[in-house]
C-alpha cells in the first residue's frame, strides 16, 4: 500500500513516533485476573484482557505527547480534565451522583497529553496502546484503511497534521535567563565561521527495542555504558577567517586570499555555541556555558580535522549544581568529566573517517596517560562487550526468535548493571542503560537500551516539572 496518510515530519524525533503494531504475545500477570504483559514494538506493555492475540493496535512510547484532538475524540483525558473530552456533557451530568461511573467513562491523561511510564504489580509498562479503530474517531477518513498492510509503520503526522511529539517540560522562569541574552545576540551583526561539510552533529541514537531486527547475530558489536549527562561535540576543523580590511580589498580585486584556517568549534547536542563571532558570548542552560568550559580544557589536544563526540557529566564548572540530578559519576563538587564516545577525522578532500570503538578508547587512554593533568577531567569509554552478537548469550538458539530473546536478556543483564544502581556514581541512582554499535557498519549509527528504573526516575522528574539540560540544549 502506498502510504501518504501516516508520515514522518522533517523535524521528527525518531524515538517518539506512533507505530502501528500487532499483538503477538500475551503473558498473564501474577495476582491478576485481567492483566497481561505483552512485548509490543520491543517494549514491555501491560494490557487488559480486552485485547487479544493478532489485534492491531496503535503504540505510543513513554514521554510522548499525543495531540489533543485524538485524546478528546476518544475521551482519554482523566476525570480531573474531563472538560476536554467529547463526552463532557454526559460525564458532567452524572459526575456528582455517580462518580464511579463517571470515572469509567474517561481516560487517565492529564492536560499535557503526556504518555507516562506506569508501574503495576511490580511491572513497568513502557507506553500506551489503543485500538486501531480509535483512529477513525479522530478522523473519519481513516475508517476504511487496510491496516494489515501498515503494521510496522511509524509516524508523527496524519494527513499532514502533527499527531505526536516528544514531551519537554516547560522551563521554569528561574532557569531561563539566557533567553533574553540570546535575543540580544540575534540583533548583533554576526560573522559565520562554519565551512560547509566540515561540521556534523551526532546522529540520532535510536531505541533498540523497535530496531532489534537491525542487529545481525553474526555482526561484531560493541556494548558500552550509557552515561546520563549532556552531549557535547568538540572539533578542530576548517573555519572561515574574518578578513582584515586589506585582505577584503585584495579579494575584491581578484587576488588570492586565504579565507580558511583550522579552528575550534564546540557544540551541545543541537546548538553550535561558537559558530558566530559576536560581541557577547551566549549564555546557556542554568546561565553557564558548560560546553565552553570543557572546550577550554580539551581543545588544544584535538588535532586538525578531528571531531570528538562525548558526554559531559558531574557538576557545572565551579558550581554545586549537577548536570543531571544525583548523577555525579565520581566527580567532586564543582567538577565535571568528559567521556569521548565517538571520533571522526576529515581530510583536505572532505573525506570523513569513522573511528571504531576500540580506537576511541585507545585515543582516550593515550590522552590521559600522556597528560596526567587530565586524569580527573577525561574518562574513557566503558566497553562492556566486544564481539559477535550471537556469542554474548551462547545458549540462545539462532532461530526466528533470536532477536526477541536477545533483547529480553539484554534488558536484565546484571553484568551490564541493567536495573541495578550505577556503580560509577556515589549517589544511589539507577544505571541509565547501554549503547550498542555495529563495527564496520555501512553507515554510522547506534542503538540505546535504557533501564526501566531510569525511565521511572525520569518520569518523576518530569512530574515535578524539572527540565533536563539535554532537552533544551
What are these regions (language model features)?
Residues 2-473:
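Core nucleotide-handling region used for phosphoryl-transfer chemistry
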